[in-house]
Amino acid sequence: ASYQALVRALGEPGDDCPLFDNDFEQLIWMIGSVAGLQAALADVQANMAVGVPFNVAPKAERGMACLDDQKHNRKWWGLPKAIRSSLWTIVPGVTPEGVDPWAELDKARQLGMDEGVRLPSALDALVSYNDSNMQRVRNIIREHANSVQSTASNREYRMPASASSDLLLELSDRLWTENT
């Protein structure tokens, strides 16, 4: 539903970047892309039972290229890089040559922790869980807990900051439940 709202508001992500009128439109673009990523991940975990169209994830990846630069990654806590890198781990053939998506996720996660909005950490943990890399998930959860203690959440963006903590808590609970 969020991805469809993105399409209605700003058009289908793809080859052309929209002309963003303001920061809010950039935020909508990113949140809609995250929704596309989450839909693709959920469908993979459900053995494709949901029926998310195969083109949603690659379109979201191409759409995020509009904001995946140094300026926008700093401004948006590493989220553009995190979204693209996350998609590179699940969509075959979209990773740029010579790029390690996991190393890019590390960079994005650090930006998010530095800026007090840890959505890149949550995305990294989700795709790591999807990749069955439970050690990486546990490390991200620990790193997140330490970061929350050392760097205050960004007051201007409390909702996404809180959502990232909620996602990581849910993953932590899932790991605990699976192992008890």
Predicted regions and their residues:
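Alpha-solenoid helical-repeat scaffolds
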Residues: 48-53, 70-73
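Flexible, glycine-rich surface segments
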Residues: 60-126
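Short helix-capping/linker segments at secondary-structure and domain boundaries
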Residues: 44, 93-96, 133
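A cross-kingdom marker for long, charged
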Residues: 105-180
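Flexible helix-coil transition and linker loops at the boundaries of alpha-helical arrays
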Residues: 1-29, 64-75, 110-114, 150-158
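Helix-turn-helix repeat elements of alpha-solenoid scaffolds
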Residues: 1-15, 51-63, 95-102, 138-142
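Amphipathic alpha-helical repeat scaffolds of TPR domains
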Residues: 18-47, 74-90, 117-127, 166-170
